[in-house]
């Protein structure tokens, strides 16, 4: 304000914090894995080229997963080959970004769960960066992506999609 009775005065907003670009990748590829070792999820990645080296990348992940039995699924986020926002292994505990467990009885192989998480990353580059997620499961289990574990042909099972959004936030 410039004083009582005067019209309001406005100042320009600060330059930082603006969204410069948004890249979204949807993945409807149905796949599965039965590995206790982390492996890339087929078709699940997004690439973005920051316009400035001090930009941050805000990432939103959602994964539609199923498990074939009462077990655990573990997920690690990556920028290229660098693990981001993930714990390290500790003794027999598995380090991961997020995890999912199923303990819901015999009909759970007809169900999917959406695993969602966000990360703010500082890649410090103007080169293209690719973000992926790797998954692993407890020994003897199978994780399914974008379908239920048994993929029954009935009105109770789903075939959802997964996706990643990458937003460049200017400094």
Model-derived segments and their meaning:
Residues 1-30:
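Glycine-rich, low-complexity segments
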Residues 25-26, 32-34, 49-128, 132-171:
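Terminal beta-strand-rich extracellular "head" domains
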Residues 37:
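Acidic-glycine-rich active-site phosphate/pyrophosphate-binding loop
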Residues 40-42:
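Short, solvent-exposed loop/turn segments enriched in Ser/Thr/Gly
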Residues 44-48:
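Extended, low-complexity regulatory regions
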